[in-house]
Amino acid sequence: MKIISKIIVILLAASMLQACQGPGGMNKQGSGTLIGGTAGALLGSQFGGGTGRLAAVGAGALLGAILGNQIGAGMDEQDRKLAELTSQRALEAAPSGSSVQWRNPDNGNYGTVTPSKAYKNNTGQYCREYTQTVVVGGKQQKAYGTACRQPDGQWQVVN
């Protein structure tokens, strides 16, 4: 029971620290670092005694923070991968004005890409203007840009 109480206190403290980050809070990578480090320190405190225990707490905190950071970064990366794959698919095959959607089932983030009519630029590349809408943590962001088809078939953002 003693360890469960410690875990609850540490998670509450981590939540309060995250809330101090202001509007939007801490990103997933920062949250993962904080929670992983806290959990690692708690786990490390269960080993050794005296200076040995102190070393175990430090090592546990460091390893937990590294692992938590990587897990948080992977989640953000998944959103970017889904958005990029959807952009490529929309620019290559979607009719003008038709939105193609992506959704990350792990965190609920989602977005759409809506391309306009394709045209050839002055170097002969096919290009399309597009609108991209992304909703992360319930907050919507919209961006406009132009992408051109490269010789390898990939679309590259040019502005």
Swiss-Prot record:
Membrane topology, as annotated: Lipid-anchor
Entries under InterPro entries matching the protein: Anti_2 (IPR032635), Bact_OM_lipoprot/Surf_antigen (IPR051407), Gly_zipper_2TM_dom (IPR008816), Surface_antigen_Rickettsia (IPR016364)
Covalently attached lipid (N-palmitoyl cysteine), positions: 20
Lipidation (S-diacylglycerol cysteine): 20
Pfam families from the UniProt entry: 17kDa_Anti_2 (PF16998), Rick_17kDa_Anti (PF05433)
Keyword Repressor: no
A GO CC term assigned to this protein in UniProt: cell outer membrane
Compartment annotation: Cell outer membrane
Keyword vocabulary terms for this entry: Cell outer membrane, Lipoprotein, Membrane, Palmitate, Signal
UniProt signal peptide: 1-19
Superkingdom, natural source: Bacteria
Main location: membrane
Xref: PANTHER family: OUTER MEMBRANE LIPOPROTEIN (PTHR35603:SF2), PTHR35603
Sequence similarity: Belongs to the rickettsiale 17 kDa surface antigen family.
Name the record gives this protein: 17 kDa surface antigen
Origin organism lineage: Bacteria, Pseudomonadati, Pseudomonadota, Alphaproteobacteria, Rickettsiales
Gene behind this protein: omp
